[in-house]
């Protein structure tokens, strides 16, 4: 992965703000266009907009703001408190299973046989993936891999994917990488994610897709000289 530095990554996140929120919101059923989403995020809600879409966007913005304020304060890390606070912000309207903490009931995932980590094992599971993340030497890549673990294990009653996406964006930026987001209602990504849930051997397939998305975002912000270096590193 191509590192661009913290300040530049923050600039890119700021420029992509509406797009990042839009992609994540599409995964949750937002019916607005990108333009309507941008207008709503700026405080001008279009006519005939569904209330639940407005609430969804407001919650995602709150989650985004929380993370990026912590980054600017040099105080953003992957830990349970930050993770749970983020879910409380982004899922305040639809997570009724111990909001602000790990879920207390088992869940089902539409289209998948996988049901997430069993409730008695959530704390142990989080400890294990935290150690895995901090021990992982694959700089940058480990952040995207962590995203997959957070999605698959389903630590919350609702809002797992949106929480994980914003955490991923924040960790990427804090480490000096360009952020990116995915609409998991897209058939290609929806299928890849479900396949990964049901078969751990499919992890590399979706990981490569996600890394390619991040690469394309990075390339779109590089100048000619940087692109040349970027392509040389790829070779």
Residues of each region from the PLM?
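FIC/Doc superfamily catalytic core
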Residues: 1-235
